Swiss-Prot record:
The gene is prc. Involved in the cleavage of a C-terminal peptide of 11 residues from the precursor form of penicillin-binding protein 3 (PBP3). May be involved in protection of the bacterium from thermal and osmotic stresses. This is Tail-specific protease. GO terms for molecular function: endopeptidase activity; serine-type endopeptidase activity. Disulfide bonds: none annotated. It is found in: Cell inner membrane. Residues 238-322 form the PDZ domain. Its main location: membrane. It catalyses: The enzyme shows specific recognition of a C-terminal tripeptide, Xaa-Yaa-Zaa, in which Xaa is preferably Ala or Leu, Yaa is preferably Ala or Tyr, and Zaa is preferably Ala, but then cleaves at a variable distance from the C-terminus. A typical cleavage is -Ala-Ala-|-Arg-Ala-Ala-Lys-Glu-Asn-Tyr-Ala-Leu-Ala-Ala. Keywords: Cell inner membrane, Cell membrane, Hydrolase, Membrane, Protease, Serine protease, Signal. The active site is at residues 452, 463, 477. Its EC number is 3.4.21.102. GO terms for cellular component: outer membrane-bounded periplasmic space; plasma membrane.
Amino acid sequence: MNTFFRLTALAGLLALAGQSFAVEDITRADQIPVLKEETQHATVSERVTSRFTRSHYRQFDLDEAFSAKIFDRYLNLLDYSHNVLLASDVEQFAKKKTVLGDELRTGKLDVFYDLYNLAQKRRFERYQYALKVLERPMDFTGNDTFNLDRSKAPWPKDEAELNALWDGKVKFDELSLKLTGKSDKEIRETLTRRYKFAIRRLAQTNSEDVFSLAMTAFAREIDPHTNYLSPRNTEQFNTEMSLSLEGIGAVLQMDDDYTVINSLVAGGPAAKSKSISVGDRIVGVGQAGKPMVDVIGWRLDDVVALIKGPKGSKVRLEILPAGKGTKTRIITLTRERIRLEDRAVKMSVKTVGKEKVGVLDIPGFYVGLTDDVKVQLQKLEKQNVNSIVIDLRSNGGGALTEAVSLSGLFIPSGPIVQVRDNNGKVREDSDTDGVVYYKGPLVVLVDRFSASASEIFAAAMQDYGRALIVGEPTFGKGTVQQYRSLNRIYDQMLRPEWPALGSVQYTIQKFYRVNGGSTQRKGVTPDIIMPTGNEETETGEKFEDNALPWDSIDAAKYVKSDDLAPFGPELLKEHNARIAKDPEFQYIMKDIARFNAMKDKRNIVSLNYAQREKENNEEDALRLARINDRFKREGKPLLKKLDDLPKDYQEPDPYLDETVKIALDLAHLEKEKPAEQAAANK
């Protein structure tokens, strides 16, 4: 599953107010409203099209070929799993795919609305069929399987093939609940409520939903960071910028019927719990003292409305971990106000023998970061640390000015980043103060979620030879977006009945390193690459549809501060020797082997109860064995079952632990270098 990397989101969509209202059971297709374009949408479409075609960094023609691509994307947004529409439905509308560009320019979006209305009808038929399937006896003893990802599969050719897909879907839903311990009666009651609720949702869909989906299909076909924001999402964007969110600190998105964790806000309740990961699915939400509400199939904004609440109140989330497992867990979080100021740099000191390494954990490039880092550097200097590690893992970026000024703390002066617009004009952003605030050994730790401003800093430190970069190749987001309202001053005078018209966010520039290479797609390749664990590996700009290409420009004029390349072989040798014996890295290597062995089958799950229970038990047994291995090494009493795990238990961080050791290796080598140079000069 590719995710859209949103650098503007502080707590995702957790401030969206959903609309939930009572609706009687929908039993006929004619009870589903036929959605039509609202009067303001024609103007909005014209303005969006004009903005994208004239001002976007990627220069493109909204011709028939591009129109066809928009159609295909819209189709997949409507029916991601290819289990709602028939092949004949797709074929019927495919004849009109080349006219979408004209529709966007004129604002007459007939194809978009007609196709959406057909999908609504087909979705109603599917859930009606699913309710009938629930009446059948449950049997989980066969060898059936279910494909979790049908996004590349052909559309079903007839209703019989479609029914077979939904037989499997219902069986998957039933088995997922059975594995949580529910009885057959409870399973039927839960799924009946879920499917009827999904049908009622169809009656609550409005014209803006169709329009937003059409604009999203258009925007995403240009590049993955270009967006149309509906009036509601524009309000949310402005709320985020005013730093007044209250929630759990997570960016959410829909994936088929599931609400999925897209990313976590550093310092927020979800991140601090250490119990929620990117890719996890929220399947239930419960308020204090109230029963858990099944939210599978809900609209995203309504799930968000349940999660939101007053600061200090508690919310329970039923989490289905990423992957194909079906064992859920309940997590209780205390809602907090998510403010950018709360995401400040955190300093710690790691001791290895008699030596000390300072660690600066930077979750985001907020305004004021550089001044905060100066203060922490002074504290570390007083503690006489041997080396410093800057941890940029999961740092999605932030203020470009802070990336430049932070880089300036570690070099005398010089260009930090080059920025080019779509006219080819290049500017340099430089450090000019001539002051170095820290001259000692420096290591920067990155991962696949380090993006944008993080990559600018890491690239500058690497190009200047100022720091050793370790970890995973970074995300590869090397573009700049601009936000613009679609409202005009005269709108309210001429059309006072119109609501707000929303806004757009689109790409206008690209970043380039001082060596001339772009950070786009390729990101920053570490000097020492750590093995990647068992998480989803297809994360990064190069996996996003329509990501702008990598390219290069002339290098800026800069003078390297140092050259760490001669230390590379020795540092790598020591690193490899350590991780070959480190139990935590041995776990990681085994997970990699397991992941690769199952790669082709990771989306195919068994619908056999005994097989699935065996898989779940094996996962639990593996985790328990590893925890007990750690406890044994630490001299702690062993656990009999996972339920006995202390609530304050924290998983080790082998990547940071190893980076600290690399930082000490670098300090030793840099200390030896002057003596070697003096001997060579004699």
